[in-house]
Amino acid sequence: PNAKDIYLIGDFNNWQMKPEYRMKKVKRFNGTWEIELKPKAMKHGDLYKLKIIWEGGEGERIPSYANRVVQDEVTKIFSAQVWAPEKPYHFRKKVFRAKTDPLMIYECHVGMSQQEEKVGTYNEFRENVLPRVAAAGYNCIQVMAIQEHPYYGSFGYHVSNFFAPSSRFGTPEELKQLIDEAHRMGIAVIMDIVHSHAVKNENEGLGNFAGDPNQYFYPGGRREHPAWDSLCFDYGKNEVLHFLLSNCKYWMEEFRFDGFRFDGVTSMLYHDHGLG
């Protein structure tokens, strides 16, 4: 709602603010902008961002609902990426019911679940780790660090892009294949989801999305978490609740996660963030 003007920029228009890519403000909705594009105006793999202009400033931002975000290997800059493969993944396991008597949970991190000194992938986890998890008698995995995050050392807890599976580990199709294979083995997949806070980063995340540092977060002293160096969502705003609840729905419907482990619940419930 704080934006004065928004342009869609990317590979398709040489990252320039062009009239045909200028977005329109929807008057009947507070703070909603839209754009109608010609067919094939954007293609699979194109990088893009929003150029947002506000009173006294401007900035390039990744859309909050972007479902694919990648980092340039040279510049290290993150951008949203159009993800519309010609052959999207189709789940083979149509119906899955987790065994919960008892539920044996194996907590894991895709990037760290391998022997080599590198970041592991969705495919490597599916091929090498899932069989060992099943052989050990577990019937559920709790997967960490799925949502995109700029700092790998945060273990995935400083999330910047809530709808984007981390591209460090591979593609969305490869994550879907991992979950599908787990279900085929009788293993439920729980996502370690982060809705208690967000990374401070402005260029990659939601920290100052349109010149309003409080658009998604509490104002004043409650905005920053005193221990995590991150920003706290304002759950009193319907728009924030819609954003987070739709995020849960997205992961369950698009990727078929079976449930969630919500990180930092005490911080969501208590004014002192559960720190005492």
Model-derived features: where do they sit?
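Short, well-structured beta-strand segments within conserved domains
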Residues: L8, D46-Y48, H183
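Short, Lys/Arg-rich amphipathic segments at extreme N-termini
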Residues: P1, G10, Y216-F217
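Beta-strand-rich binding/interaction modules
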Residues: K4-Y21
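The feature marks proteins involved in alpha-glucan
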Residues: P1, K18-E107, M112-E117, E124
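Substrate-binding/active-site clefts of carbohydrate-active enzymes
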Residues: K94-K99, H109-G276
